[in-house]
Regions:
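A charged N-terminal "starter" segment
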Residues: 1-127, 166, 170, 204, ...
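Charged (often Lys/Glu-rich) extended helix/loop segments that serve as interaction or gating elements
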Residues: 5, 236, 247-394
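General structural feature for long, well-ordered alpha-helical segments within catalytic domains
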Residues: 22-25, 29, 50-54, 72, ...
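Active-site beta-loop-alpha junctions enriched in small/polar residues
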Residues: 24, 45-51, 68-72, 91-93, ...
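Structural preference for beta-strand elements that scaffold enzyme active sites
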Residues: 41-43, 64, 83-87, 108, ...
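Short, glycine/charged-enriched secondary-structure capping and boundary segments
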Residues: 57-58, 80-82, 102-103, 123-126, ...
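Short glycine-rich, flexible loops that bind phosphorylated cofactors or substrates
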Residues: 118, 138, 361
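Active-site loop/helix belt of alpha/beta enzymes
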Residues: 135-275, 370-372
């Protein structure tokens, strides 16, 4: 949570919806992560928040970058990073994007299928490659599992990495992902064991890998849902690495996104309407000017439960309310099965803060669904530029 944002918003009303970011909190999170994960190289997952000021900050901290597209690579390079600090980490890349990345100097690519490996060979010759595997625990403990769409099994990983050299590529490492917002530190144990088996099998074939990629998934705190400290994750991960690799550990990299930027943002929204469906209905619906199509996509299935506060009505009595977005799509309902406590006195025009929204919000925002503008983003020091006078009733 960032008090700087709440303090900055206390005396002004800004144009909504708007995501306000605190770079000081991001810098603090990054330094803490590096300290707790000592000897592990940090590749920021750009997809979490690719705002230019976020990227330039992390460049100044000497971070590495995990990019999901050539467009993200372009943003990172524009922020001042060197192509040698970039991994093209998506396993789904057009041949033209691989070629474009290679042209600007990127030499590290991830894959999980034979055809993808061939594309890298054709368009990025001589590059280092990392094969992503499926974890055996199927994303248990994650709020947002990622295990079905990506990765291959252990046997295929061995076969593909065995072919990489013959294709003119450098077989470098194996990666996995335990799922986003992973609240179980032990989730990394089994995949690290899987990696050790693959390393041994390839070593027997004369192929020495040099990198372990333990992926992302490191969580941030949402509301009252406490998560383990990063140090707890570090202890479990390093213990597993010691068990399975001993003193012969290769380079280890991690790809945090949410853990670095999640708690560094607050979406400022406005109540559009408070309604009931009949005169006898006690259930309120609260419609905000931000919803599933404006950055809150991770409320899908109510997986991520953001904390909502109403600064002007902190002392008001509350009752549960269904929370929905502003569009003409019924899917744009955020919390219906588990309504949120909202002030009884809440009315249209009230400001609602959606906390811990620094990750996976603005990048999810639609370009113009229902004609509504994408979610605006500003830095906390620039909120004065986003303000507007309160409307006066006629």
């Amino acid at each position: 949570m960032t008090l700087r944002i709440e303090t900055a918003l206390a005396d002004i009303k800004i144009a909504t919806p708007c995501l306000v970011l605190d770079r000081e909190q991001i810098a603090k999170n990054y330094k803490n992560f590096c300290h707790k994960m000592k000897d592990i190289d940090i590749f920021y997952a750009v997809k979490a928040n690719p705002h230019p000021d976020v990227l330039s900050l992390l460049v100044s901290e000497n971070a590495y970058f995990d990019c999901a597209s050539f467009q993200e690579i372009t943003l990172v390079l524009a922020a001042g990073s060197h192509p040698s600090n970039i991994c093209f980490g998506s396993t789904l890349k057009k041949a033209s994007d691989i070629a474009d990345a290679y042209k600007v100097g990127v030499r590290y690519f991830t894959f999980d299928a034979k055809e993808e490996l061939q594309k890298i060979s054709d368009h990025a010759p001589g590059s280092s490659v990392c094969c992503r595997i499926i974890t055996n625990d199927f994303g248990t403990g994650a709020q947002w599992p990622l295990n079905r769409k990506f990765g291959c099994d252990e046997d295929m990983a061995v076969d593909l990495m065995s072919e990489a050299g013959d294709l003119g590529l450098i077989p470098s490492g194996i990666s996995f992902h335990v799922g986003s917002q992973q609240t179980e530190p032990t989730a990394w144990q089994a995949p690290i064991a899987q990696l050790s088996r693959i390393f041994r099998q390839l070593a027997e074939l004369g192929i020495a890998l040099d990198t372990i990629n333990i992926g992302g998934g490191f969580p941030t705190t949402f509301g009252d849902d406490a998560v383990p400290d990063i140090f707890t994750y570090a202890k479990v991960i390093k213990a597993a690495l010691n068990v399975h690799f001993g003193d012969k550990k290769p380079r280890v990299i991690a790809e945090p996104g949410r853990a670095l930027v999640g708690d560094a943002g607050i979406i400022v929204s406005e109540v559009v309407l408070v309604a009931q469906k009949s005169s006898n209905d006690s259930q309120r619906w609260v419609y905000l000017d931000v919803g599933r199509f404006h950055g809150l996509a991770e409320t899908e299935g109510e997986a991520i439960r953001y904390r909502l506060t109403v600064p002007e009505r902190q002392d008001s009595a509350t009752t549960p309310a269904i929370i929905a977005g502003p569009t003409c799509d019924s899917v744009d309902t955020l919390y219906e099965h588990n309504p949120v406590e909202m002030p009884v006195a809440l009315k249209s025009g009230d400001i609602v803060l959606v906390h811990d929204t620094g990750a996976y919000t603005a990048t999810y925002s639609s370009v113009g669904f229902n004609g509504l503008s994408p979610l605006r983003v500003c830095l906390v020091e620039d909120v004065n530029q986003m303000k507007f006078p309160k409307l006066q009733a006629i």
